Amino acid sequence: GSSTYDHWGGNRIGKNLFANCILALNARTGERVWHYQVVHHDIWDYDLPCPPNLVQVKQEGKIIDAIAQPTKMGHLFVLDRESGQPIFPVEEIPVPQSTIPGEETWPTQPFPPSSLRYAQQRFTEEEVSQRTPAATKAIKERLRKMQTGDIFLPPGLKDAVTLPQFNGGTDWGGAAYDPIERTLFVNCSNEAEWISMNKAEPPKSISRFELGKQLYRGLCASCHGHELARNPGAPSLTDLRQVVANQPVEHVRSILENGKGQMPKFAVLSTDEQEALTAFIRENGKDKLLNRASLQLSYADAIPYVATGHNEFKDPDGFPVNQPPWGTLSAIDLDKGEIKWQATLGTYPELEAQGLAPTGTFNMGGPIATASGLVFIGATM
């Protein structure tokens, strides 16, 4: 996983050891054998969402036991299983630096060879969708008010584009491996989102509802959204309110403390913060002002800047703002460290009806490779 808070790391200066990494442990002793970090000082929620594949790679006539790790960034890291060293060279490349006060982003990020980068990783006016003249014009007008550029653009006070978005690239589904051909099959989403940061410090007096709103924005909006859900499987704020309205307060607080399903626990929250977050979700506590000095805050005081959430970036008709393909399936030759082929994955029937070729779609799932040479995948959304 990544270090918290996801989008501001001024209280965790440095690379953040063991976050965003592949970790090899000796199963007999529990001792660390090696680790390899794929993102330094993550402020993009670019955690490793899926386990690596155990693979073999042939180099100079020798078979090497290795692992292949897909990522949300669309980087494939291929590492020697014994040593953790990259089989194909990884370069530390300078990336843009944060302008948020107190934040110290790491100056470089690890990039595998371009032949092992299988996602779109840049969004400027040059990459804008050409689906219709009206859509292109609207997107470009929006972009002129935003930070744009290459991957690892840090969140700032101004809206910043993120491509791949926070769900990838590759997400939970992972990859499939053909051990005969030594080929890895990995699907990928190519859709942009945007993010910005706001000051989080509560005023001297604040209602329980408003304090809960600030906490929700920092802790919950990235999955549950402000209105619509951001992550598949996470109920939207609207749906969440309908569910929680019928639940005892103690039950809601138990979920905050212990987590449930895919939701992690938020045991760091003080009792005051739990009550405020519950009040916001239940839409009460708007009238009574709380004295800031009397509140016990463990989280709200620690994070001076919070994200506005993982915000969808669509054209006026609801389609992705960047050029297709918006979803792909790639076959990667692990001996050569390069993409054999890349196919468009998914389609919008309404766009096909207009005469457009399949564009691909956002996808959440993984492929299966068979011994008979077939690859099966659903995953499209």
Task: Describe each region flagged by the PLM.
Residues G1-R208, E273-M381:
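Beta-sheet-rich non-transmembrane sensory/scaffold domains
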Residues S207-E210, Q214-R217, S222-R292, Y299, ...:
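Extracytoplasmic electron-transfer domains, predominantly the class I c-type cytochrome c fold
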